[in-house]
Every structure is written in structure tokens, then in C-alpha cells.
């Protein structure tokens, strides 16, 4: 029974945390594993559109091949709305206010308030109502601010689509980069490798277009999409080869398409409107919050009944005992936790944005601080984001203009995703030569790049009788489809001797830190029709183009800073192991034994996990290799970050605890990431890690303070309840004490953090929290018991008639010691001298202490059932507080030496 109640309470707590802020959004479509019903009308409409001729498409969608003009766009948007999913639309303010109220802590307070009102204790009911109001409003305001900050940050890195629009009254059109929420049905858009499908589309032109639909269909392999259907009698819209759906992504190829549905009208939009709850795997932050919350709630559920039984049995007044036990339960619940978490994360996100780090999901900040392994690609991270074409040689290593011109034709005429290598090739040919080449050779066709083949081809023609296929790509993949080489002007077979020559030349280039790309050609009789991958066979190896990818000046100090921060950096690259090892050496990273992709193919998960733990450099990896390595490192208990910006990085970005990409990354990589860097630099990343640790430390302060003081208070209550003939403190006193303490905690997100607390990864550790409670909780109990003795024997408050004096004395000691513990526990150093809190926290705690001491002397004292304390009480109060702080400091020194300090 206890387990069921605990689970239900925690479920309510977890729902209370701002879901959209501390849960990573699944890729659009990823949640459709939940069975949901699609309206038959939508399926029928999709099937009709899939089979339509282009002329019919223009008519049905009120569009035309030139694109929509401004007036047509306005009409379409008025009819269909913005291209946003239902779940992305903000809820009304009153819904947010209700969500902020309905947490187990406020419900407990409300029950207690109702009981107080029913027993005509109106003042207590008013105080409880004030507590509920403050807790709810603070959380509401902080969540609203956090939501606004998160939305503003997300808007800075929103995805775009390439759209054909009419741009003036003369009917001139142009391809424009527009945010995807501006798309309307009838728009014509262009797709390329790496693009997210921004709406439901009907393909009108396609070139080797392959789309990953696993998020919708579960099919792991990409499927080809075409402009004219090959299966006219298809019954399942998701299997129609002329349709693409929102939430899927382009793996390879290019296309043009007409937008047939946006927002709620899309296939995924219909699913999102019908799916109310999805199972989301918790990341490291969410698991930590879950474990800590469960620990505190279980402690509350165990101790409150114990307090009830002891007080009811010893005092005989079970009704009063029940009220007191319920007040103790309220005092044991960390009702400010949601607000502290939300405001701390939001403040960290805003600070990071000023350091060129955009946080898409607020919990990523804490994961930043917890990260102990960073896996990253080499290009643009360790190296400069500018690649220089250094050599263009034949197979013997001699400079060759012919090889350069072949590479230029390939880079110039390909329409897929142009990378830094293509840019370097295009810049490596002067304008005169480029004009001559483009005038002499006409493009016939292309075979786009994909990560399975790791090469791409264009087909060009100089005359009408012969076509030339020009292929460039990774050396081994090019060699796999070559049977001949061009050697000293002659075409000779690619035999073992030639292969050894090729390896010798390319290894020499690799050792110089040059990245080698092979170039091959093939002459074919002119023909009609498309060229396919099968045509990439029996090629002639022409030579190589070699690129210099020099390390950044900031890489070495950034790696040193990351190492000093307790983060292990691992390089996961698709590049050659020789090039990667050279770069690692130049930046001071000890690569050790290098593991290549083919080495891990046959390894079991356990063997690869052990290998991954001790290996720094992995080379020649596929996207699935990267994902598998990241997943296994997580399985071993590490908090893993992955930094990448390409299509091949998306699976690993998604698998990591924290996915990190850059503003210039492809759509699918940015969508999969939790954090976007406006500057692709490890130094910026290191600053983010430090901010994450500051954020975590401030959150942990609240939990440690609350847990330890609550533990001590309960122990004190149990002792007092067992031996006193009256309640040690009235339920109302506990509530006021709790309210004042909560007010003092509001400033924790603004507190300073000691340098030593941000020098290593910070992890949630419920076991450490339990140990912390056991060590520090009894300290307050010791001085509470001394206070009991003081009030009983020195001030003779030992009868029911003098219980108000007793309760007033413990009220002041309890509140001041509970407030001072904030300063004692926030640092492992000597508080106020070696480490001072930020001024907001100093001011709030001082204010609460002044209010606490003043209440027994105020006009409210009689209403609160407190009384003025004699002046002789205050020297004893100072002695108790000094003794309390001294013992806490001594225990803190022992604890930090024995167990460390978070």
C-alpha cells in the first residue's frame, strides 16, 4: 500500500515539473509508437494525392509551378493556420496556473487548511492559504519566465525550408529560406540530404531521394521516393512512394515537392492530437530528480504516521496529534523543489545564451554539468571550420590538373548537401578555368552521396555520343568499385602492385595530416534514362585530392580545460585513422591505440563497452557505429555528451544524454540536439559545462538543506513528543516556520558557487543524500534537545500552562538554526569568511531571521499563540547558534575529507 501511495505521489510531482522544459522532445513522429486512430478521410485524401498528375496537383492546391504569391500565401494561412503541431501551441494561462497548484505539496496544505477552517481556526486557515498562494504564484511566475526564455532561445535556432515564392508584381520568383512555420499548403519546396520533412509533401521532382521513415513506420531502412508512382494501387499512405510526411528526414538525394498539409492537418498532427500520454525514456537529470524525490517522499510517508502514533498515545488527544502529524508531513515535503529547479535552470539558460550557447531543453544544463565523457567529431571541432585543398595528384603522388578538374566537375554539378570539401575544391580552381570547364562539360545526371556508399557521382558530357561518370569519395569505397588506374597517361589494371602503390602514397599524405579523397571516372555510351548506383562499377582511379584541416588554436587549451574539469574526450570520426591520429597529436590528445569501424563490427556489446572505455580515438566509423559506442558508454554509467553537425551524427546525438550541435548544422542534427552552439568551439563548450555545474550545485543546495534540516526536525519532534506533556510546537508554528524558510530559499538560484565545486562532474546520488541526512540532521537535533532542556529547567516552561513560552523558545531556535544551515551547507569552506553567499540570499535569510525573532514580540503573537521571550533567553540563543555552527563546521570538515563534497 505504501509503495502504491508513494508511486502516485511521485507521479503527481513529476507531472508538476514543467514538462516541456525538462523533457527532451522526441523527434517529430517518434512518439507514434502509441496506437492512435487516423481519420479515414485523411488516409483517402493522401492516397488520392499520391496518384494525382501534376496538372491536377496545381488545381487541387491552388498553386502553380512558379510558386505562391503573397496574397495566395495569406489566404492559405488564414484557411489552414500556421505550420505548428497542436502540442506546440501554448496553453491558456489559467491551465498553467492550475498545473502549478496541483502538486502533492499544495494538496496536503489545502487539506490541512480545510481541516483548520472546519474547526473554526480561521487564522491557521489563512496562513495555510497564504502558503499555498505563495508556492503556486512563485512557481507560476518562474515557469512563465522559463517558458518565455526557452521559446526565445529555440527561436534563435529554428529550422528553415527552401521555398519557391513569387517575389514581386511582375511574377518573378525565387527560392527563399523561410522558417518552417511559415509554410502553407500549395508551397513548392526543395529538399536535400539532411533536411527534416517540414510538412506533408507530394513529390513532383526527385533524384535518388531516400527518406528515413522509421519514426512513423518503424522501418529501419530508408525508402526511395519518386515523382511518378510505381505502385498505383497502394492502400497504405505511409507506403506511397510519392508522399513524404512531417517528422521524417532526407537521407540522400534531392527533390522538389508540393506542400499538401501543414500543422494539425498533417499525418503526425492528427496523431499528436490523439496521443495524450507517451512513454519517454528519462535522461540522467530526470532519473536523478526521480530518485531524490522518491527518497524524500518515502521519508515523509514513514515519519508522519510515527509522529501521529507517538503524540496520540502520549497526549491522548488524537485530533491534535493528527493535525500536528499532518503539519510535520507538510514540513517534510520539498514544496519549493519545482520552483527552485525551474528558476535555476532558466537562469542558467539565459546566462549561457550570452556565451553563444543556446539551450533547447533546460534539463540539458544539468546534464552539461554531469557529463564525464564527451564524444566528438574531428572536423570543425578539433580543427578549423575551413578546409584547404592542399594537393591534387595522380596515383603516384605527382601533381595533376586533370584530377583537379574531375573533382571540380563533381563538386560543381552535384545538387545535394555541399560540404567543406566541395567548397575547398570549388575554391581551388580559378575563375577562368571554372568558366571553361562549365562551358565545355554539360551535366547529364547525378548519383547522390549516402553514408552507405560514402561516395557520389555526376554524369557529364562533352559531346552527344559519350557520357563520363565522375566519382569522388572515401578512398576504400572508391577502390571497391575500381578495376583500372590511370598511370603515366596509360590505363592499366588495378592489381596488387598498384594497390600497394596507392596505399603507400595515401598513407604518406595521411601522415602529413592530409585528408585524402579519391577521384575515379568511367566513360559510357550516351543513353536516355537515369543513372543508378549499379553504374558505379569498373571505374578508372584517376588520383587523389588531399585537404589540410588544421587544428584550431583554441583546441589544445580547451582540451586541457576539459581534462582539468574531469571530462574525458573521445574522438569518433569517419576520417582516416592516420589523419585523425596526427590531429590528436598536434592538439596534445593522447590517441593511444586507434580502433577503426571494421574492428568493432564483430564485437559483442560487452567487449565493445570495455574497449570504448579505454579508447580515445575511433576512426572510419559509420553513423550506427557512433550510436552504438555512445549507447554502450551510457550503459556503463557515464553521462555522455556527443557533439556533431552532420547527417551521420544524428543517431549518436539522439542516443547521448546531451546532444550538442552548431547553428550551421544540417536540420536533422539540430533537431536531434539539446544544445546549439553559435560558435563551434570546445572552449565555448567548456564554459557551458561550468555553468551546468553551477546550476546543479544550487539545486543540490536546496535539496541538502531541506533533507538534513527535515531529518533533524523530525528526530527532535519524536524526542519531544515522547517526553513532553504537551506538543513541542503547534501545527500553526510548524506552518509559519515552513513558510518563512521557503521564502528564504527563493534566492538560491542566484547564489555563488565555490570554485572547487565546479572542478569535476556533478551527479545525482541519492545514497550520498541519505548519508548527508544522517550526518547533518542529528546536529540540529542535539541543539534542539539542548533548547528543550534550557526551556524546561532554566526557564521552567514545563507545564501545560507554560507551554507557550516553551514553544516560542523552540520556534525561534528552530527557525534561526534552519535558516543558518543555508549558509553552513552551501559551501565546504568557512561561511561568511572564506565563502560568502550572493547578496540576494544574504538579504533574504537575514530578513527571515529578523522576522522570526520579532514575531513573539509583535502584535501577531497572541494570534500565533507565541509570547515574548525574556531578555535572558538571548545570550543562551547566541550560545546555542554558535555551538550549532561550530559543530556543523567540524562535521563538515570530517565529512568532506571522508566522502567528498558536492
From Swiss-Prot:
CDD domains linked to this entry: P-type_ATPase_Mg (cd02077)
Residues reported to bind Mg(2+): 335, 645, 649, 713, 738, 742
Origin superkingdom: Bacteria
Cytoplasmic side: 1-98, 142-291, 340-699, 749-770, 823-835, 891-902
GO molecular function, one term: metal ion binding
TM stretches of this protein: 99-119, 121-141, 292-312, 322-339, 700-719, 729-748, 771-794, 804-822, 836-855, 871-890
Coiled-coil boundaries: none
Enzyme Commission number: 7.2.2.14
Keyword terms of this UniProt record: ATP-binding, Cell inner membrane, Cell membrane, Magnesium, Membrane, Metal-binding, Nucleotide-binding, Phosphoprotein, Translocase, Transmembrane, Transmembrane helix, Transport
Active site per UniProt: 377
Topological domains, Extracellular: 120, 313-321, 720-728, 795-803, 856-870
Enzyme class: translocase
Family: Belongs to the cation transport ATPase (P-type) (TC 3.A.3) family. Type IIIB subfamily.
Free-text function comment from the UniProt entry: Mediates magnesium influx to the cytosol.
PANTHER family linked to this entry: CALCIUM-TRANSPORTING ATPASE (PTHR42861)
Protein name in UniProt: Magnesium-transporting ATPase, P-type 1
Amino acid at each position: 500500500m505504501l509503495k502504491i501511495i508513494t508511486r502516485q505521489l511521485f507521479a503527481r510531482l513529476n507531472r508538476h515539473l514543467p514538462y516541456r522544459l525538462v523533457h527532451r522532445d522526441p523527434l517529430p513522429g517518434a512518439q507514434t509508437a502509441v496506437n492512435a486512430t487516423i481519420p479515414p478521410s485523411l488516409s483517402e485524401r493522401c492516397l488520392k494525392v499520391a496518384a494525382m498528375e501534376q496538372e491536377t496537383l496545381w488545381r487541387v492546391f491552388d498553386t502553380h509551378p512558379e510558386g505562391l504569391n503573397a496574397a495566395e500565401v495569406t489566404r492559405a494561412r488564414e484557411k489552414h493556420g500556421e505550420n505548428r503541431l497542436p502540442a506546440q501551441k501554448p496553453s491558456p494561462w489559467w491551465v498553467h496556473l492550475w498545473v502549478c497548484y496541483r502538486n502533492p505539496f499544495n494538496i496536503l496544505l489545502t487539506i490541512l487548511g480545510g481541516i483548520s477552517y472546519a474547526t473554526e481556526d480561521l487564522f491557521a486557515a489563512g496562513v495555510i492559504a497564504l502558503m499555498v498562494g505563495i508556492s503556486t504564484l512563485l512557481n507560476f511566475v518562474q515557469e512563465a519566465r522559463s517558458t518565455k526564455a526557452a521559446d526565445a532561445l529555440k527561436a534563435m535556432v529554428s529550422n528553415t525550408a527552401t521555398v519557391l515564392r513569387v517575389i514581386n508584381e511582375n511574377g518573378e520568383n525565387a527560392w527563399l529560406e523561410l522558417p518552417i512555420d511559415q509554410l502553407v499548403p500549395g508551397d513548392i519546396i526543395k529538399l536535400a540530404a539532411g533536411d527534416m520533412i517540414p510538412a506533408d509533401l507530394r513529390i513532383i521532382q526527385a533524384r535518388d531521394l531516400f527518406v528515413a521513415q522509421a519514426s512513423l513506420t518503424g522501418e529501419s531502412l530508408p525508402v526511395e521516393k519518386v515523382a511518378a508512382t510505381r505502385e498505383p494501387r497502394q492502400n497504405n499512405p505511409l507506403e506511397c512512394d510519392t508522399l513524404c510526411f512531417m517528422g521524417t528526414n532526407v537521407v540522400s538525394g534531392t527533390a522538389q515537392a508540393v506542400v499538401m498539409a501543414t500543422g494539425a492537418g498533417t499525418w503526425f498532427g492528427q496523431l499528436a492530437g490523439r496521443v495524450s500520454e507517451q512513454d519517454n525514456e528519462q535522461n540522467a537529470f530526470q532519473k536523478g530528480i526521480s530518485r531524490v524525490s522518491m527518497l524524500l517522499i518515502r521519508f515523509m510517508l514513514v515519519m508522519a504516521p510515527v509522529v501521529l502514533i507517538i503524540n496520540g498515545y502520549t497526549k491522548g488527544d488524537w485530533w491534535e496529534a493528527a493535525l500536528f502529524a499532518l503539519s510535520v508531513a507538510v514540513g517534510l515535503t520539498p514544496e519549493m523543489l519545482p520552483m527552485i529547479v525551474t528558476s535555476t535552470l532558466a537562469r542558467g539558460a539565459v546566462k549561457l545564451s550570452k556565451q553563444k550557447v543556446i539551450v533547447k531543453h533546460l534539463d540539458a544544463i544539468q546534464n552539461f554539468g554531469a557529463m564525464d565523457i564527451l564524444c566528438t567529431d574531428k572536423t570543425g571541432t578539433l580543427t578549423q571550420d575551413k578546409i584547404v585543398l592542399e594537393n591534387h595528384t595522380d596515383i603516384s603522388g605527382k601533381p595533376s590538373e586533370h584530377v583537379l578538374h574531375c573533382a571540380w566537375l563533381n563538386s560543381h554539378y552535384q545538387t545535394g548537401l555541399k560540404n567543406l570539401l566541395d567548397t575547398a575544391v570549388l575554391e581551388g580552381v580559378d575563375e577562368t578555368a571554372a568558366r571553361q570547364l562549365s562551358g565545355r562539360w554539360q551535366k547529364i545526371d547525378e548519383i547522390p552521396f549516402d553514408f552507405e556508399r560514402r561516395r557520389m557521382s555526376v554524369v557529364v558530357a562533352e559531346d552527344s555520343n559519350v557520357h563520363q561518370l565522375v566519382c569522388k569519395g572515401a578512398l576504400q569505397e572508391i577502390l571497391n568499385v575500381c578495376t583500372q588506374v590511370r598511370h603515366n597517361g596509360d590505363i592499366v589494371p588495378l592489381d596488387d602492385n598498384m594497390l600497394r602503390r596507392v596505399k603507400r602514397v595515401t598513407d604518406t599524405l595521411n601522415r602529413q595530416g592530409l585528408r585524402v579523397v579519391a577521384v575515379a571516372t568511367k566513360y559510357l555510351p550516351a543513353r536516355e534514362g537515369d543513372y543508378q548506383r549499379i553504374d558505379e562499377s569498373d571505374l578508372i582511379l584517376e588520383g587523389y585530392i588531399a585537404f589540410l584541416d588544421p587544428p584550431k588554436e583554441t583546441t589544445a587549451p580547451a582540451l586541457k580545460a576539459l581534462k582539468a574539469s574531469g571530462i574525458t574526450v573521445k574522438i569518433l570520426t569517419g576520417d582516416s585513422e592516420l589523419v585523425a591520429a596526427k590531429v590528436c597529436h598536434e592538439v596534445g590528445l593522447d590517441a593511444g591505440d586507434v580502433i577503426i569501424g571494421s574492428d568493432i563490427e564483430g564485437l559483442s556489446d560487452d567487449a565493445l563497452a570495455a574497449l570504448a572505455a579505454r579508447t580515445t580515438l575511433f576512426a572510419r566509423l559509420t553513423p550506427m557505429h557512433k550510436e552504438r559506442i555512445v549507447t554502450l558508454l551510457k550503459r556503463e554509467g557515464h553521462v555522455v555528451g556527443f557533439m556533431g553537425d552532420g547527417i551521420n551524427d544524428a543517431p549518436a546525438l539522439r542516443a547521448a544524454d546531451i546532444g550538442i550541435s552548431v547553428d550551421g548544422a544540417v536540420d536533422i542534427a539540430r533537431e536531434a540536439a539539446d544544445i546549439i552552439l553559435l560558435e563551434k568551439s570546445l572552449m565555448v563548450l567548456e564554459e557551458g559545462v561550468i555553468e551546468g555545474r553551477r546550476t546543479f550545485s544550487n539545486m543540490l543546495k536546496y535539496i541538502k538543506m531541506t533533507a538534513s534540516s527535515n531529518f533533524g526536525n523530525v528526530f527532535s519532534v519524536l524526542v519531544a513528543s515522547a517526553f513532553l506533556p504537551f506538543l513541542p510546537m503547534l501545527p500553526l508554528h510548524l506552518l509559519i516556520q515552513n513558510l518563512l524558510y521557503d521564502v528564504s530559499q527563493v534566492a538560491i538560484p542566484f547564489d555563488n558557487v565555490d570554485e572547487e565545486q565546479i572542478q569535476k562532474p556533478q551527479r545525482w546520488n541519492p545514497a550520498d543524500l541519505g548519508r548527508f541526512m544522517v550526518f547533518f540532521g542529528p546536529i540540529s537535533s542535539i541543539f534542539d534537545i539542548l533548547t528543550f532542556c534550557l526551556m524546561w529547567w532554566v526557564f521552567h516552561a514545563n507545564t501545560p500552562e507554560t507551554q507557550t513560552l516553551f514553544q516560542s523558545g523552540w520556534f525561534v531556535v528552530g527557525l534561526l538554526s534552519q535558516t543558518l544551515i543555508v549558509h553552513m551547507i552551501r559551501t565546504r569552506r568557512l561561511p561568511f569568511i572564506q565563502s560568502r553567499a550572493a547578496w540576494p540570499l544574504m538579504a533574504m535569510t537575514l530578513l527571515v531571521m529578523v522576522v522570526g525573532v520579532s514575531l513573539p514580540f509583535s502584535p501577531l503573537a497572541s494570534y500565533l499563540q507565541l509570547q515574548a521571550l525574556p531578555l535572558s533567553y538571548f545570550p543562551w540563543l547566541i550560545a546555542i547558534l554558535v555551538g550549532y555552527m561550530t559543530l556543523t563546521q567540524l562535521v563538515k570538515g570530517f565529512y568532506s575529507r571522508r566522502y567528498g563534497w558536492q
